[in-house]
Structure formats: C-alpha cells, structure tokens
Amino acid sequence: WERTKNWNFGVDLELFHMFYMNLEYYTRRSNAVITVDLPFEYGINDMKRNGGIIYNRGIEYTLSFTPVQKRDFSLNINLNASKNWNKGGETTIDRTTGMYLTGSNTQILKEGYPLSGFWSYSFAGLDGSNGKPMFNYVEVPEEEKSKGIDPTTYLVYSGEKEPYFTGGLGLSFRYKSLSLNTSFSLLLGSKKRLTSPYNDFRGEHNMMPDPTKNINRDLLNRWQKTGDEAYTNIPGLPIWPLGIAWTLPNTETAESPIYMWEKSDAMVVSASFLRCRNIGLSWQMKKEWCDKIHAKNLSINFNMDNVFVIASKRFNGFDPELENSIMPRSFSLGLNIGF
C-alpha cells in the first residue's frame, strides 16, 4: 500500500480590480510503490512493493496584472509558474549501473537526490594515439573489484531529467481596433543526454558506417588524427577491438568504450529553454465601415506559432523538447465576416 501525507497552503488575492494572485505551497511525503523484477522460477516477471520514502514540495502561482484599462487602450500581463523539489529517502531496492545511467522518475536511486536524477561516466578525454574515449574512476585493480561497490563511486551525478522550474508569460495589448497577443514559456533546470552520432551504426558490421546510409554530420568533427583530442570530444571511428568489454569496479560489464562515451557527462547538456510560442495580431473593422458593406462585423487576424526558441547551442538546431527533430514554425491568416 502507498501512504501519502499532504500539507497545502493557498492564498487568493485581488487588488483594485487590477491585480490578481493565486499562490499555493505544498509538501508531500509518501512511501513509494515500485516495480521490482523477480527471478524466473517465481513464475511472474515482476511485482509491486514499497521501496522507499519520497519527499516532495513545491510552489505554484498565477499572477494577472492589468496596469491600463481604458476605452481605446488596454494592457494585460499574465504569469504562471511552478517550482518543485523532490528527493528520495531510504530505499530497499538494488540498483545497477544501468539504472543510474538511465535515471528514473518512479524509483529512488540514491538517498538525498531528486527522483529524476541520473548519473554518467566521467569523461577524461580522448586517447591521442587512436581517438578512443577514456574515463575517470573506472579502472581499479582486479583485487579491488567487488559486487558490493556502489556505482556512484565511479559515476558522476549529471542532474535532473525533470525541470525544477516552469513558467509561462502572456501579454495582451489593445489599441482601438488593433490587438496583439503573445505567449512565452520558460523551462529551467533539466538535463538531457544528447543523441550519439554513432547511434545509427547500431547493428552494422564492426560499427562502421554503411555507405548506403546517411550519417550524422557531427562526425565531421570527430577525432581523425593525433592532436585532434585538443579540439573535439567525439571519438574517432572505432579501430580498436570492438568486442572489448570494460569490467567495472562492481564487476558489471560495460558494452564498449563507445557505449560508455555515449553515457558519459560529455554527452549531457542543459535542456533549459525560453520559447516564444505564439504571436497573434488582429484588427476589427469599425461598425460604420461594416454598415457600408452590409456586414455585422469583420475582422482580420494573423498568427505565428513557435516563433523562436533560445536553448543550448549543443542541440545543433534541434528542438530541446523534441531532441532529434525540429518543431515547425507555422503561419496563418484569417478573415471573419458576419452578416
């Protein structure tokens, strides 16, 4: 059973018919229900059980401000935002290196860390002789390797997958029969792992590019000769034995140096962004003009969606929300006539 304790505090405030605010603060404590894998001999793949304590707290608020409200001119500003914190308490689940690398939104990985936190291999640069990626903390003497070693002793914390702050801003401006509306969104605090330029090579012989397929343009900046390691962190085409597996300090096995590089902090990027989601402009024809064309009303409107986004340059033009594609910009022009 999952047990949850909540505490909420809220305030609604309105002043002079110009300013409105809604503010809510909450805390929540729950004993998490998690899914755990079971051995084959149990006859089922997994089961639900209590796996630890989760602490959540956050603040959400909405502000609306109308500094000017006249017959021919008005301005309205709307702001909504939320900031959330969570962390895991004690947990009883067994955690693997893969779980730390992937992260989780439902399981506690490490006490005191956010629920959506994830970890990475610590990238130490490229080998100048062959472009092979190197890593900190993973090479230890064989006699010191043990199944009981905590993976976070050789991994580094990379941040949260979920944002700790989200916000939206809306502006409405009217002058006589002309109206302008805009909306913005802001997301702060989340981290993402970039898609590997070697991702399309999966399944190819020796992980070398297939001449019949396109390849990621980031590979133009890969290591190609001695000295390139000073300017790039993208490994060279793997000429070292691909079958080589890296035995980690806790005796788990990493697939290959390329895989470890893909899961390293070299591939972690800030996913914070500011986006202008919409700009809308409309014009309403005066009633006396409408009468001349025997119409009750007439309006023309123009809208632009996904106007721009400001995000990390490491996305190389891709959208920080979609990762591997681009959110298209769209335009619309409309004419409304009522008779």
Predicted segment positions?
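Membrane-embedded beta-barrel scaffold of Gram-negative outer-membrane proteins
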Residues: W1-G43, S82, N86
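Outer-membrane beta-barrel signature, preferentially recognizing the C-terminal barrel domain
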Residues: W1-Y20, M47-K70, G112-P114, L126, ...
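Outer-membrane beta-barrel channels and translocator barrels
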Residues: T4, F16, R28, N56, ...
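Transmembrane beta-strands of outer-membrane beta-barrel proteins
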Residues: F9, M21-L23, L75-I77, L169, ...
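Short loop/turn motifs that connect adjacent beta-strands in outer-membrane beta-barrel proteins
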Residues: M18, V68-L75, G88-I93, K110, ...
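Transmembrane beta-strands of outer-membrane beta-barrel pores
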Residues: Y25-N31, F65-P67, A81-K87, Y175-S177, ...
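C-terminal beta-signal and terminal closure region of outer-membrane beta-barrel proteins
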Residues: G51-N56, L101-N130, H205, L219, ...
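Extracytoplasmic gating/loop element in the C-terminal half of outer-membrane beta-barrel translocons
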Residues: G189-H294, L298
